[in-house]
Amino acid sequence: RHLAKVEVASSSLVIRSIPFPHRLFALMRFFVFGGDFLNELLSLVRKAVDKYRMIEEGDCIAVGVSGGKDSLCLLAALGELKRFYPKKFTLKAIMVDPCFFGNPTDYSEITELCRRLYIEPVIKTTQLYEIIFQVRKESNPCSMCARMRRGILHDAARAAGCNKIALGHNTDDAVETFFMNLLQGGKIGCFQPVTYLSRKDITMIRPLIYVSERQTENLSKKLNLPIIKSPCPADGNTAREQAKLFAKDLDKTYGKVYEKIIGALERRRIDGWTDEDPSKLRRKSKPGT
């Protein structure tokens, strides 16, 4: 069996065949090493998946893999979940390479991880760094980069035959987004656990919404995941980083701030969040009820 590694440079498409041998024992060692950490992650991921009905029978899900701890934990969790989840689905790992400083990113260790998880890796090479930092010289590069990466990811997922995209946004990300919307935009809001994009005809899911950044950090170390440190010049100097520090300060003062804000989003049903249990949601979705 073979996997297709897809590289897109400008408008050209190059497909290279990658051997895909069975590596059952390597896969078993990978997950046994994670121990209770992986079980805890899987429990929280399944809670989100079940509650918001993120996965349906026959889904082909593109996992957006940046190379950070969150996206790699998501890749590992969904790779394990698909082995026993009652609804059968397939996974593809899509990496959008910005080519920082004109250099392609080395994804070899991540593609090896994909082989161990029986997931097809797809790499899309772009000129994002050149466009944003050298051509346009953006004063606010993060916003533009995020928009462009999303568009590229959406198109790559559709081209790969996927109907859903899984993103690695965790509990901390949700709380930081809440504060950014409140303090910068003067509105109460957050990203949605599940979002259907009608223009792209694709659904975004966020299975890590109940997983904290501390948990993904611990698990990524325990599993020795192949994290790629971001060489982005703007890394660590963003509005989100300020929101992160603000949330941490509040948590030190008041305690359980992250859980409280997630609970408030769900109780008030803000932006698709809900506090209803999955069984009630399913009953409501049945025709004639």
Predicted regions and their residues:
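Intrinsically disordered, low-complexity polyampholyte segments enriched for Lys and acidic residues
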Residues: 5-7, 36, 284
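Short linear/disordered segments characteristic of secreted peptide precursors
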Residues: 13-15
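N-terminal, intrinsically disordered charge-dense segments
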Residues: 1, 19-35
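The feature marks non-catalytic terminal segments
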Residues: 225-289
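Short, basic, helix/turn surface patches
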Residues: 146-158, 194-200, 247, 251-266
